[in-house]
A protein has these predicted regions:
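RNase H-like two-metal-ion nuclease catalytic core shared by retroviral integrases
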Residues: 45-48, 137-139, 145-149, 159-181, ...
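Active-site beta-loop-alpha junctions of metal-dependent nucleic acid enzymes
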Residues: 87, 105-128, 144
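Mobile genetic element proteins and their domesticated derivatives, centered on retroelements
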Residues: 6, 25, 59, 78, ...
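C-terminal domain-tail junction helix/linker
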Residues: 153-157, 179-238
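Short small-residue beta-strand/loop micro-motif enriched in glycine and branched aliphatics
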Residues: 101-105, 159-162, 186-187
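Conserved, non-catalytic sequence blocks in retroelement Pol enzymes and Pol-derived host proteins
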Residues: 15-17, 64, 84, 139, ...
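Basic, flexible linker segments flanking DNA-binding modules
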Residues: 1-69, 219-229
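An active-site-proximal beta-strand-loop segment
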Residues: 63-103, 109-110
């Protein structure tokens, strides 16, 4: 977790037993080598050389750009490799663009669409509204596939995709990947089963305990639940 967020959490404890300045906390963490180094390793997971249709980018800045003003208007999706002690697993994430909540995830043994679509289906099962929803991703084979697109069609979800190789066109999804891998998934799981347990715990902590600067130090679940108290319907079609 970042120093500013840790500073906020420490200074908002109910018992008020600790009061420390941000700079002092930063220096203290550095002195004891507790600052988490940012990892820059990059592994390509996107295969955009395929025959399937690529949807236009609805989130690209222009006069008709779509902006998420409340939860469950825009979801962003991405896939990242998860190193194991022997080999790798693949983590698929679906995140709400407004609340920053991870609404669906799945750890699979490979990049097959059957694994990636499980995160999307999980997110849809948990959804409690029926308003218009955009699913935004890169133009990788998995997201463009007949299987993945059929879930869009059955549930009335609008599809949006990046229009090139610019990672900034799916920056939020990339950012969530980085948070999980740099703050939570610091050690290599022994195998796929352990990876799934660690990711499950990490997602729960991220959603329910980690404050976000963009959310005025609220957690993603705080923002999402405040929205859900107003709207509670789900018509998911598998």
């Amino acid at each position: 977790i970042g120093t500013r967020k840790l500073h906020y959490l420490l200074n908002t404890q109910a018992d008020k037993t600790l009061n420390i300045g941000r700079d002092r906390l930063f220096n203290l963490l550095g002195e004891y080598r507790l600052l988490v180094p940012v990892k820059r390793a990059y592994h390509k997971t996107t295969n955009s050389h395929h025959r399937f249709y690529r949807h236009p980018n609805l989130l690209k800045p222009d006069p008709e750009q779509v902006t998420a003003l409340e939860p469950e208007q825009v979801w962003v999706a991405d896939i990242t490799y998860l190193p194991l002690r022997s080999g790798t697993a693949c983590l698929s994430l679906v995140t709400d663009a407004c609340s920053r909540k991870i609404v669906g995830y799945h750890v699979g043994e490979n990049l097959q669409t059957e694994n990636v679509v499980k995160a999307f289906r999980q997110a849809l099962r948990r959804r409690k509204t029926t308003g218009p929803l955009i699913h935004h991703s890169d133009r990788g084979l998995q997201y463009c596939s007949v299987l993945y697109q059929s879930v869009h069609e059955r549930n009335g979800i609008t599809c949006s995709m990046t229009d090139g190789y610019d990672c900034y066109q799916n920056a939020l999804a990339e950012r969530i990947n980085g948070i999980l891998k740099n703050e939570f998934l610091l050690s290599r799981p022994a195998d796929l089963e352990q990876a799934r347990e660690i990711v499950k715990e990490s997602v729960a902590i991220y959603n329910h305990e980690r404050p976000h600067l963009a959310l005025k130090y609220k957690t993603p679940d705080d923002v999402h639940q405040a929205f859900y108290r107003q709207k509670t319907v789900n018509l998911y079609q598998d």
